[in-house]
Amino acid sequence: METLTELGDELTLGDIDEMLQFVSNQVGEFPDLFEEQLCQSYQGNNAMDTTLPKAYNQAAQQPYTTSAPQPQLLPVKAPPQATPQRTAPLLQPRPVVQTSPQPQLQQQTVMLTPNFSTAPQTRIIQQPLIYQNAATTSFQVLQPPVQSLMTTQQMQPVTIQQQVQTVQAQRVLTQAANGTIQTLTPATVQTVTPHVQQVPVLVQPQIIKTESLVLTAVKADGSPVMTAVQNPAITTLAGTLQTTALQVPTLMGSNGTILTTMPVMMGQEKMPIKQVPGSLKLAEVPKEGERRTTHNIIEKRYRSSINDKIMELKDLVMGTDAKMHKSGVLKKAIDYIKYLQQVNQKLRQENMALKLANQKNKYLKGIDLSSLVDTSIGMKIDEFNQNALMMSPPASDSGSPAVFSPYSVDSEPGSPLLDDEKVKDEPDSPTGLGMMDRSRMLLCTMTFLCLSFNPLTSLLHPESGQYSERAVQHGTGRTMLGVEMSGFYGSWFDWLIPTIILWLVNGVIVLSVFMKLLIHGEPVTRLHSRSSVKFWRHRKQADLDLAKGDFGAAALNLQTCLCVLGRSLPATRLDLACSLSWNIIRCSLQKISLVRWLLKHSPGYCKKAEFQDEATTSARDAALVYHKLHQLHLTGKLPSNWNCSGLNLALCAVNLAECAGNKISPTLLAEIHLTTAIQMKTSFPSRFRFLTAYFLGYAQNASSEETLPDPMRWLAHPLGKYFFINSNWALKSAAKDSLYTSTRNPANPVTQIHRAFCESLLEKAMYTMAKPETSKAASEEESCEFSRAQEYLKLLSGFADSVGNVASLPLGGSSPMSSADPICRWWYSVSSMAIGWLQGDDSVVKSHFAEVERIPKLLDSDNPLVKAVIHMCRAMQAAVLGKCDGQQNSFYHCEKASAFLWNSLNISSTGNTNLNKVVQLLICDLLLSLRTSLWQKQSSSPAAGDSIHAPTPALTGFQRDLSSLRRLSLTFKPAHCKLFLHEATVRLMADASPTRTHQLLQHSLQKCTALANKQGDLDSLPGQRERATAILLACRHLPLSFLSSPGQRAIMLAEAARTLEKVGDRRSYHDCQQMMVKLSGGTAMAAS
């Protein structure tokens, strides 16, 4: 059993002071809590003999905690006529559920006689003790939080008024003078009368110490019940005390008061708590109450600190007047930090570019190379460490270690190149610095001047010069001697040796210059060096920016990559001129096989395999960066003030890609040369087409047809190559969805040209359907009229399935994955369905109708032209089905398509206007042909020469479509070939005068003549299908007087049948055969 002495040894003055401060703070939060009770207590002491019945409301008890209890008051109801008595406030009780009804309160006066010990001063504690009855025989002592302490020089007995419940047992707490507590046995109190009596309790004063006062309440069995005392000067300890049963003599006074004298029995272990010096701190585990109290204080301070910092963030970011919740403040702060990081990154990149430019300027001024290398190395290392410090995030809490990885990137996954263990802390070699383009051009100019004037000639032939001077000075006689001397010195051997030596020296000089320019002058980045780490960091960030579509940030990161590699974009016109001139010279030299062989077998190239591998790797990385910058420049994502910037980027990419050798894939090499061909076509649209053809052929030779990627396979076709070289296409800087193709990669010019090629194929296919070939060679061919259109559609279907990914591709090259163009596929199905209807093939119409109904999400389905196409296809499908209500449904969809077509003509089209007009012409022709077919089906096979008047709705719709065709013919010349035929048809449907109808049909029967040489005249002439349809209409609906003899009509029908069979119109061919059968039967009957 732990004694009080041991407990006293464990306590320190610091612990006691901390607890006292905490208790005083708790009490200070309720300053006026006990003012009323103290006033009532004072009045109760003055009138002790007055009795007052009180009603006591019992409150719900709360769970007991070891922390400082909060005072709780129970309301006391007093009648107005009674004198107010003092009521003691109840503190936090034990969690014992009371089930008994409210007991009556009885006040008794108990006289306690404690033991005294001599002390200079006496402290008197006035404490009301409240005894509460529970369901069990145990009791709880509730002690108020405020005690009034009085000190007197003389020991005087005082009375303490207490409210005592009528219970089965009572516990009385006494304080010993030496700091210990004696617990008495339960005393039985008998209630004589049912009313409440006032019993004063007389307690003798006792001498205690404030530092060692301990109060402990125990049960009858000796276990402690309550160990917390709300007193700033009292330390509460729990311990098992020895209890001794005492007989309490009870005396009854004359006035009904009960006087009880209770002797106090002291415990066996009665030692005061030792005072520990304040400077001594015992390392011990804090008790439960202290731990929770300290934890609460820490939590409160932590929350206060967090709130203060959040308020400080709000003041910094949004100002002091802004109002926003904590999460909003943190979000704004995060956005502002990201913005500052981007600004710092841009400033660091500009700083790096300026430092590199400063280094190159110093190099040109003739500064010692070794000192420049050392300075640049130290500067780069310091800047790299500073950048790492700025890029690394701060520690999340104060307990986190203050170390960081200088190569960690938050936005990228872990990479072996970014590990600190694998990064070599080695400086760049002197050859890795490279030469500037101005230095290269200066060296080339000096070499050319040296070879032009050739000062070595005078050094190798000094005698010939001296002899010529002597011959001139000594006249004719010396001239003969001179001739003899010249024959002696002018032998072929004397001439050959100096010449060979001269050319050898010149060759060595030229080869040395080439080695300096092409090998040693190239900047080389060492593998796993700090420059390499920084390069890959920015290149990965550029890939992420391209994937997100942030082309400005991607271009900035790519330019930073060039600066890290020792290369930078030209900043002035002089730099651009020098760079472009050097790249043209280098491209010309690399195409010469002898120069490539000499450079490949030179000592500087073969001196070290590791250096060669690093040089080719650096060339490959630089070529990829130049290639991506060139793509951004061509697509308008990298604006430039100079026209030759794109040409310079293209030549840089080509030269470095050829220097990379096997380090670069054939697919990427072909893509680089193809992009250069696009640049040549853009820079020289009408001249120097051989340059475009040269780079295009090199791209095709660099990669075979098997390894050629799908997005570039269309260039292997003759139509694709012809379109690339001779067509007037233009790159679109803004890649948006159109009515005919879906969006390609906005940063890849090859995909943009592929998109233009697909639209060109679709335009040719639809134009061939709407206006077939009218030339004499085409008319003599036995092939189908729509065969050329079917070839175009077949090519379109194949190339639309190999578009390539729409998202931005990484710098490593094109992605092998390919995707189809859903919009191109949809228009392919529409065109195939139209060809099936014109050929009379119902199976083709039914097979493609399901694909037409699946409208792509990327297609603008709200466009009137698209809606007209959809309703036109539905009308054809309803006419083909042949159901009882098929004609009615077909007529309904024809009306819908006609209305949308008229709206599309009123709207100014944006995009490919020629293709829009071709589609509108095709829709007009199909709608008019479909209405003519429906009218002929309703005519119920009339005899030759008879005509049936069409219904008014059908005639109105036909006239509206004919008006659309007339309006389209004003701006589109090929619409004239359809106009005469459909005007004759509407006159037949209206049963108009046959004279004008015959003239219109006669115009449709015209053939191509030798006078129609212009393209406009050819476009206005009708095709073979229109001539055959005009013959059928004339033979079926015109009167017999407008035609020749029956034999001539049979000849015309036979010619129309051959034409329809050649063009592949099965439906019209079947109708023509039926007319020929009827005509032959009628002729036979007339002849008989």
Swiss-Prot record:
Protein source organism:
Xenopus laevis (African clawed frog)
Question: Which UniProt keywords are listed?
Answer: Activator, Cholesterol metabolism, Cytoplasmic vesicle, DNA-binding, Endoplasmic reticulum, Golgi apparatus, Lipid metabolism, Membrane, Nucleus, Steroid metabolism, Sterol metabolism, Transcription, Transcription regulation, Transmembrane, Transmembrane helix
Q: Which GO terms describe its biological process?
A: cholesterol metabolic process; positive regulation of cholesterol storage; positive regulation of transcription by RNA polymerase II; regulation of Notch signaling pathway
Cytoplasmic compartment residues: 1-440, 516-1088
Q: PANTHER family this protein is in?
A: STEROL REGULATORY ELEMENT-BINDING PROTEIN, STEROL REGULATORY ELEMENT-BINDING PROTEIN 2
Matching InterPro entries: bHLH_dom (IPR011598), HLH_DNA-bd_sf (IPR036638)
Q: Point to the regions of Polar residues compositional bias.
A: 59-70
A single GO cellular-component term from the record reads: ER to Golgi transport vesicle membrane
Q: Which gene encodes it?
A: srebf2
Q: Where is this region: Leucine-zipper?
A: 340-361
Under what name is this protein listed?
A: Sterol regulatory element-binding protein 2
